[in-house]
Amino acid sequence: NPVDDHQNDDHHDAPIVGHHDAFLKAEFDLTSLNADLEKFIHHEIEKEIHDVENHTEHNKHEIDALHLEIKQLHEEVEYFKSHHVAFSAELTHPIENLGAEEIAHFDKVRVNSGDAYHVDTGKFVAPEEGFFYFSVTICTKRDSILEMALHVNDHDEMIIHADAEHLELGCASNSEIVHLQKGDHVEVVKHGADGVPPFYIHTMSTFTGFMLH
């Protein structure tokens, strides 16, 4: 029957159209998914770049701060090195028959940070204005009484009195804090004619000083 055949044809064509629509819909969904995925990836990449830039900027600030701190520490070290003044000196050989106001040359230098003590003259010369601590120990042998003085710019600052009149060895120490100007000189001298000859200074004697601030 022709009519039946036509009806049968219509009945068989319907599924083909449905499959085609489903294919188109799937293709559309895939395109949309790709677009969404591309948008998501782009967003994540932008976010990652932003985070990296922020992290880099933060690190840059930290690095700059570290450089500044290192520079300040370097300046402090250089300041300390240039302002750290200290010395300690002894005698290589004993000194005998020291004359009045004669300088005792402590020629065996243990420490001389800042090079302010001059072994050739026996004088300490202040490299800058400040407060300085000085200590002097004088030892003398039997039958000798010896008076020494710490001179600051040729004026007595303190006296050291060593007495070995009834001892094999007599020692005395004294110390002082003085305020010095740059260029002021400090030395240990025989205190006039006071004492009992032979005015002998033992090698155990010392002259020490350092800058407080």
UniProtKB/Swiss-Prot annotation:
SUPFAM superfamilies tied to this protein: TNF-like (SSF49842)
Domain C1q: 80-213
PANTHER family, per database record: COMPLEMENT C1Q TUMOR NECROSIS FACTOR-RELATED PROTEIN 2-LIKE (PTHR15427:SF50), EMILIN ELASTIN MICROFIBRIL INTERFACE-LOCATED PROTEIN ELASTIN MICROFIBRIL INTERFACER (PTHR15427)
Function: Binds heavy metals. May function as a carrier of divalent cations in plasma.
Compartment(s) of residence: Secreted
Keywords per UniProt: Cadmium, Copper, Metal-binding, Secreted, Zinc
Organism expressing this protein natively: Mytilus edulis (Blue mussel)
Expression by tissue: Pallium, gill and liver.
Name of the molecule in the record: Heavy metal-binding protein HIP
InterPro entries: C1q_dom, Collagen/C1q_domain, Tumour_necrosis_fac-like_dom
Source taxonomy: Eukaryota, Metazoa, Spiralia, Lophotrochozoa, Mollusca
Entry GO terms, CC: extracellular region
